[in-house]
């Protein structure tokens, strides 16, 4: 058989072909999502109408708020999940406890795991979900649009002068992100340089002194303007740099909406004057 790659196809035709190749014998009919991010992925992939239950804080889109909750920070309600008879469970590998998931898998329930550490993996998850969706073309189109948006941001901000960026999560204790997280990738996408990218653990706890020695030029947090005020006050008087607050749900969820946070960050980073080169 001639490899498909030898004959370039129009984009729309390629998406349709992928949809046909990945269409399962029977799409999922009863889906349960165990995290807010996988709930958003389900809707983006055309599985929203098939959701029968979700996790706490699954609040986007609006229709997700009407669904029953079977998971929270306290754990997973295995008994209730079994009563709902799902034929697909969407799980967050980094956030859901593994033991109840193993129990559910042992009973023959298919489990789709999502835990992207690279921004392009969100598009890959959408492509993979197409095999379970009654509308696989919607999943592939969402993945393609996501990739296009990422590439647009990369092209637009690739030549930006890097700004040393501190990703701040909390104050007491003070946590940040290594270079192996989605949040760090968003910073890089916008021309930022994560000052703790070299950390060996994904979410290191750091001291005030360690942050100061790395001389950040901008601080990025998730939250509202009040968070900006609190963080600015926390660092005074030793550190006076711009603080950018990003929509918490956009920035912290591994879903297509993370690109809204990226756009928000890129625009604000670009408006910050590049500091005069420091003498060494």
From Swiss-Prot:
Q: Write the record's keywords in alphabetical order, separated by commas.
A: Disulfide bond, Periplasm, Signal, Transport
Site feature location: Important for BtuC binding: 79, 209
PROSITE patterns assigned to the protein according to its UniProt record, in alphabetical order: FE_B12_PBP
Q: Which organism is it from?
A: Yersinia pseudotuberculosis serotype O:3 (strain YPIII)
Q: Where is the Fe/B12 periplasmic-binding domain?
A: 30-277
State the protein's name. Answer: Vitamin B12-binding protein
Report the protein's function: Part of the ABC transporter complex BtuCDF involved in vitamin B12 import. Binds vitamin B12 and delivers it to the periplasmic surface of BtuC.
SUPFAM superfamilies linked to this entry: Helical backbone' metal receptor
Pfam family name, one: Peripla_BP_2
Q: Which GO terms describe its cellular component?
A: periplasmic space
**Domain of life of the native organism:** Bacteria
Location in the cell: Periplasm
């Amino acid at each position: 058989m001639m490899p498909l790659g030898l004959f370039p196809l129009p984009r729309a035709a390629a998406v349709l072909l992928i949809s046909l190749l990945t269409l399962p014998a029977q799409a999922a009919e009863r889906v349960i999502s165990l995290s807010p991010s996988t709930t958003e992925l389900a809707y983006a992939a055309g599985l929203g109408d098939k959701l029968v239950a979700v996790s706490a804080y699954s609040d986007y889109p609006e229709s997700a708020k009407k669904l029953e909750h079977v998971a929270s920070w306290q754990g997973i309600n295995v008994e209730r999940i079994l009563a709902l008879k799902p034929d697909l469970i969407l799980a967050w590998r980094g956030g859901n406890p593994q033991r109840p998931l193993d129990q559910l898998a042992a009973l023959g329930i298919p489990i789709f795991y999502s835990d992207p550490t690279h921004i392009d993996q969100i598009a890959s998850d959408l492509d993979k979900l197409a095999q379970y969706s009654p509308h696989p073309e919607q999943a592939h189109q969402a993945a393609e649009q996501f990739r296009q948006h990422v590439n647009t941001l990369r092209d637009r901000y690739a030549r930006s002068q890097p700004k040393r960026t501190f990703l701040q999560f909390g104050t007491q204790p003070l946590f940040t992100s290594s270079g192996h997280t989605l949040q760090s990738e968003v910073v890089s996408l916008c021309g930022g340089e994560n000052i703790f990218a070299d950390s060996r653990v994904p979410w290191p706890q750091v001291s005030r002194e360690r942050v100061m020695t790395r001389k950040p030029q901008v601080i990025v947090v998730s939250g509202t303007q009040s968070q900006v005020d609190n963080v600015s006050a926390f660092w005074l008087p030793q550190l006076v740099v711009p603080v950018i607050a990003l929509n918490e749900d956009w920035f912290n969820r591994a879903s297509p909406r993370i690109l809204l946070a990226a756009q928000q960050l890129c625009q604000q980073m670009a408006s910050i004057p590049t500091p005069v080169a420091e003498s060494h």
